Amino acid sequence: RSNFMLPATIRDNAPYTIEAWILNPEIAENESVADFTSSHNELEKLMLVNGTEPRCGVMNHYGWYEDAGYKEMKTLEGKWQHVYVCFDGRIESIYINDKLISQKDIQLLVKPSQFMLLGKNAEEAWPFSGYLHSLKLWDEYIPYKKTNKIN
């Protein structure tokens, strides 16, 4: 749990980019890698997930349509995953290992956050059982570029 808040520049429907390198030997249904918001309200959530839930197993906004999962997530057990999420204020694109797995036109309502959490969500549930090599969050849209680092 952090002692700092989400940057003030990430509010409402503001652009952001998230990048992470994850290794998870056994991926459960819902595992929160990082919850960037302490909110519990619909569309106010920015949570990076590493789970098998096909509806929200990669990115959770506490929406329904706005969330994103990956039906083939279980095939990534024991393999490094390069996860890249970029949102320009309208379109959210999600890539795993250079593959576009989701691209949606969404509307978010991100509010000021009291803290950020690694390894579980703001409700202190959905524990992450894997390894996190790096995690980056930008308050701007950075289009995805192929990494050439994925086997």
Which stretches of residues belong to each language-model region?
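Extracellular glycan-recognition modules
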Residues: 1-58, 77, 91-92, 123-127, ...
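Short, aromatic/His-centered strand-loop micro-motif at the edge of beta-sheets
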Residues: 57-82
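Aromatic sugar-binding interfaces of carbohydrate-active proteins
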Residues: 151
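Flexible glycan-contacting loops in extracellular carbohydrate-active proteins
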Residues: 104-132
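Localized edge beta-strand/strand-to-loop motifs within extracellular or lumenal beta-rich domains
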Residues: 79-93
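Beta-strand-rich interaction surfaces with strong enrichment in secreted/lumenal proteins
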Residues: 5-8, 69-75, 105-107
